[in-house]
Amino acid sequence: MSLREEGGFCVAVLEGRNLTKTFRQGKLEVPVLHGVSLAVERGEVVALEGPSGSGKTTLLCILGCLLTPTTGRIVIDGQVITAGRPERLRDVRRRSIGFVFQQFNLFASLTASENVQYALNLKGWRGLKARRESDRVLDAVGLGDRKDFRPRDLSGGQRQRIAVARALAGPASVILADEPTGNLDSESGKIVLALFREMARTESRGLLIVTHDPLVRSVADRVMTIRDGRLTHGEA
């Protein structure tokens, strides 16, 4: 049974069910997450807030199949993927999840278009198909006329928009963003957040944003708060 249902049908594109995470430090087992459950629907923007050390980035990495939970399950597009082999988890990351991080992580030697196409190549998109998709998402984020520029020739806000375009390129149904406005001025942050809101609605993506930025509340459908590894507000 899904965490959020409507009329008997699952409407969540991403679910975490009773997630826990424990890290070993020497002889000690240190718990970081305690039975966290959440769901993100298609077309929905969810903000996840919490102080430093609260477990929010660990939770994001687990939901993105970058870390394995100690217990609990991840469900993406209705499929349980937690127990899969490493190769399957890698394929899920490439096919179903787009990532946006505070650090842009762009290749300095590649153009905006080539940066997006590189991500598409990892998803199995090649040649004309990849170029057309790159053009589409760069147009969508307002950088169609900058597609042949390299990152050094663009502003911080424009570089982050390339990162957004890269996450949106291809079939990803879930976008996970970790402090995406952290290195941006207020105006650039507003532009990036407006892009997130528009893309979630027009392309039916589910978007989870880990943030300290109060501006994110202006585009979020729901706000969840995590403290000491537990959701204290907005739990599914």
Question: In which residue ranges do the predicted regions lie?
Answer:
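ABC family nucleotide-binding domain
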Residues: 12-226
